[in-house]
Amino acid sequence: MTQKTIRVGDIEIANDRPMALFGGMNVLESRDLALRVCEEYVRVTGKLGIPYVFKASFDKANRSSITSFRGPGLEEGMRIFEEVKKAFGVPVLTDVHEPWQAAPVAEVCDILQLPAFLSRQTDLVVAMAKTSAVINIKKAQFLAPQEMQHILRKCEEAGNDQLILCERGTSFGYNNLVVDMLGFGIMKQFEYPVFFDVTHALQMPGGRADSAGGRRAQVTDLAKAGISQGLAGLFLEAHPDPDNAKCDGPCALRLDKLEPFLAQLAQLDALVKKFPPIETA
């Protein structure tokens, strides 16, 4: 099965290439914190030889509570992203929530992310696709993996085949998500790169009444399970003080654990991709 390669700057992303990392923080809490977090990611990924893209949100439009922190907004967010790119020379990924945001965000960011909750919104999908930017498509918690082909077709019909799929867990009753490992193989059949968002797969949506809970202690186990499927890469959020993060702290890896965490995953990824495929159908 041929696997497509997506290029982001100098980075080549594909299911049969060494894993890449979309990593950063959940939301831009401040300029200084964004620079601090990105600096550590750049140091660790450079040491380990992992292709790296910085990620963060400028606006968390789907928070549980109307009083929850959302971020600096588009204008200030783009200024921070521009500074991150200038300081560290890395590509940047961020999510957009409304069609009008797609074009201005694409002027700054290298990858636009289609949020899971909004992944069937055709007007948003088409607006993002028409920017010609690479699009990271989050699989909605309520969609089966095979249904992702319809979102891919929408993007292709709008003229964009620079696409990445991203698993982030499936609703399992109330306030819980699970990851179906068989889903990775189904999505890889579409030939586009597949990533695993281990951070949000650890969520317990609404688990803290007015915000999401999480299971940070299981991040290594779940990440290893995902990477064992031979994926294009991992989507990860880390924070120097997760217990006081302004969004999704219960799911975030502690920043000081980033190097040992990624070192193990890079070794596992290399091992898995050494194995020749076995036809069992």
Curated annotation (Swiss-Prot):
<dbReference type="GO" id="GO:0008676">
    <property type="term" value="F:3-deoxy-8-phosphooctulonate synthase activity"/>
</dbReference>
<comment type="similarity">
    <text>Belongs to the KdsA family.</text>
</comment>
<protein>
    <recommendedName>
        <fullName>2-dehydro-3-deoxyphosphooctonate aldolase</fullName>
        <ecNumber>2.5.1.55</ecNumber>
    </recommendedName>
</protein>
<dbReference type="InterPro" id="IPR006218">
    <property type="entry name" value="DAHP1/KDSA"/>
</dbReference>
<dbReference type="InterPro" id="IPR013785">
    <property type="entry name" value="Aldolase_TIM"/>
</dbReference>
<keyword id="KW-0963">Cytoplasm</keyword>
<comment type="pathway">
    <text>Carbohydrate biosynthesis; 3-deoxy-D-manno-octulosonate biosynthesis; 3-deoxy-D-manno-octulosonate from D-ribulose 5-phosphate: step 2/3.</text>
</comment>
<dbReference type="GO" id="GO:0019294">
    <property type="term" value="P:keto-3-deoxy-D-manno-octulosonic acid biosynthetic process"/>
</dbReference>
<dbReference type="Pfam" id="PF00793">
    <property type="entry name" value="DAHP_synth_1"/>
</dbReference>
<dbReference type="InterPro" id="IPR006269">
    <property type="entry name" value="KDO8P_synthase"/>
</dbReference>
<comment type="pathway">
    <text>Bacterial outer membrane biogenesis; lipopolysaccharide biosynthesis.</text>
</comment>
<keyword id="KW-0808">Transferase</keyword>
<dbReference type="GO" id="GO:0005737">
    <property type="term" value="C:cytoplasm"/>
</dbReference>
<keyword id="KW-0448">Lipopolysaccharide biosynthesis</keyword>
